[in-house]
Curated annotation (Swiss-Prot):
GO BP term, example: ribosomal large subunit biogenesis
InterPro entries, sorted: KOW, Rib_uL2_dom2, Ribosomal_eL14, Ribosomal_eL14_arc, Ribosomal_eL14_KOW, Translation_prot_SH3-like_sf
Record-stated family: Belongs to the eukaryotic ribosomal protein eL14 family.
MF (Gene Ontology): RNA binding; structural constituent of ribosome
Keywords attached to this entry: Ribonucleoprotein, Ribosomal protein
Gene name in the database record: rpl14e
GO cellular component: cytosolic large ribosomal subunit
Annotated protein name in UniProt: Large ribosomal subunit protein eL14
Stored Gene3D superfamilies: 2.30.30.30
């Protein structure tokens, strides 16, 4: 099972959207992926993200690479994951980062 793949759910661990869940929409290169919340579901805008700034979750939805926000939202509804996506995750800071 590859960890970074299209349709995989993940949590942003850095930046202003830290703790919010998102979906990998497209793999750009070895270091970056295109993610989306969609914004009206979890608050994450469609944007490029470094793979070191996301934490992959075991859940996966079936979408095509480059899927629109509407297609992602529909796939989340079909999988029954809309409420799961709206929940935030608490990011624990390591003592060295304080």
């Amino acid at each position: 099972m590859p960890a970074i793949e299209v349709g995989r759910l993940c949590v942003k661990t850095r930046g202003r959207e830290a703790g919010r869940k998102c979906v990998i929409v497209e793999i750009i290169d070895d270091n970056f992926v295109l993610i989306t919340g969609p914004k009206d579901v979890s608050g994450v805008k469609r944007r490029r993200a470094n793979i070191n700034h996301i934490e992959v979750l075991p859940e996966k939805i079936n979408i095509q690479p480059g899927a629109s926000d509407e297609e992602v939202k529909k796939a989340l509804e079909e999988a029954g994951l809309l409420d799961f996506m709206r929940e935030r995750v608490r990011i624990e800071l390591k003592p060295g980062l304080l």
